[in-house]
Amino acid sequence: MRNLILVGPMGAGKSTIGRLLAKELRLPFKDSDKEIELRTGANIPWIFDKEGEPGFRDREQAMIAELCAADGVVLATGGGAVMRSENRHALRAGGRVVYLHASIEQQVGRTARDRNRPLLRTADPARVLSELLAIRDPFYREIADIVIETDERPPRMVVLEILARLAELPPR
């Protein structure tokens, strides 16, 4: 396996699950959003404020291309990374892709106190999350090798299911 790539909506558990998978597989863990922050010295909300979403998405595309070219990495992507066809191609070519699916209720609960999510700076985050999932879900599914439900499941159980399901996949 080249890389293990996690996609899915905000609050699906990509970073938490990714860290655990990396530890289990003894691989480095990378979060594309955190890597952008490290590289720029600015947090994601600041980048959104100063450059707008298109500016952030340009940075994200460059970072995903770089990280997917690596070998032996567990990568958690931002929720909107799949919106650009270039990213979908890079992610699919970069390794095995796992779509972590979470219900809107779970997403709201997991993101409620996180101030680092510019798209959720709204009076009705559930509506925004629902709209985003409706648009993004087909793209997550398009590139996923496997889809994993994360609702009300301990991260360790999700990790074990991912490892078992990956072992069942034919080589590509």
Swiss-Prot record:
Name the positions where ATP binds.
G11, A12, G13, K14, S15, T16, R117, R153
Cofactor(s) recorded for this entry are:
Mg(2+)
Q: What class of enzyme is it?
A: transferase
* Residues that, per the record, bind substrate: D33, R57, G79, R136
How the cofactor is bound: the record states:
Binds 1 Mg(2+) ion per subunit.
The record's annotation in CDD domains points to: SK
Q: What is its main location?
A: cytoplasm
What InterPro entries does the record point to?
A: P-loop_NTPase, Shikimate/glucono_kinase, Shikimate_kinase/TSH1, Shikimate_kinase_CS
Question: HAMAP family annotated for this entry?
Answer: Shikimate_kinase (MF_00109)
Per its database record, what is this protein's job? Catalyzes the specific phosphorylation of the 3-hydroxyl group of shikimic acid using ATP as a cosubstrate.
This chain belongs to the protein called Shikimate kinase
- Organism per entry: Pseudomonas syringae pv. syringae (strain B728a)
Gene giving rise to this polypeptide: aroK
